[in-house]
């Protein structure tokens, strides 16, 4: 099988295109949070520890949610969690004491989505294209992440406007992907 066969099949082409948008939104948001970490109030080491702990919790939660509600609903629930964190940040970004809670919500939702897209990639494409599609999506998303440091350096609260827009775009695209395996 050739990569051309991946593109010629309407279902896999659709999954590849919509997954690419979801992955790009996800990875850009992931790195916006990573680069924005230096601006969070408090000790950067404690903030990094909190982010890592929230990642562990979100990875465990992602598997449970995916098993209970399926792919599309788990993508939407993780994006809603991330979007809620960014919306709360946009409204209360001047309240320094609650910002870490909003950032944790953003991080949990984003890390849940990261785990979900990695785990379910093999269900969106035939076996012979699973590795190729994974590589294509990883490459495209990380190329798009080049702009994340620029977004993170924008004045407050613009990075979280971009974060929220990415969540909404990914949420819309999640309705168009279909599992085939």
Q: For each predicted feature, which ranges?
A:
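Flexible cytoplasmic loops linking transmembrane helices in multi-pass membrane transporters
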Residues: 1-35
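C-terminal transmembrane bundle
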Residues: 23-26, 34-181
């Amino acid at each position: 099988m050739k990569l051309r066969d991946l593109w010629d099949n309407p279902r896999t082409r659709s999954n590849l295109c919509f997954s690419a948008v979801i992955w790009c939104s996800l990875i850009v948001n992931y790195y916006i949070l990573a680069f924005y970490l230096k601006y969070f109030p408090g000790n950067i080491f404690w903030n990094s520890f909190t982010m890592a702990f929230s990642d562990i919790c979100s990875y465990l939660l992602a598997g449970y949610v995916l098993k209970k509600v399926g792919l599309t609903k788990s993508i939407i629930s993780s994006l809603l969690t991330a979007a809620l964190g960014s919306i709360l940040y946009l409204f209360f970004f001047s309240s320094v004491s609650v910002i870490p809670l909003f950032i944790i919500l953003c991080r949990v939702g984003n890390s849940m989505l990261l785990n979900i897209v990695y785990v379910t990639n093999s269900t969106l494409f035939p076996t012979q294209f699973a590795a190729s599609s994974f590589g294509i999506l990883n490459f495209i998303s990380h190329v798009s992440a080049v702009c994340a440091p620029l977004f993170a350096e924008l004045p407050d609260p613009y990075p979280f406007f971009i974060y929220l827009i990415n969540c909404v775009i990914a949420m819309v695209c999640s309705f168009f992907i279909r599992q085939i395996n």
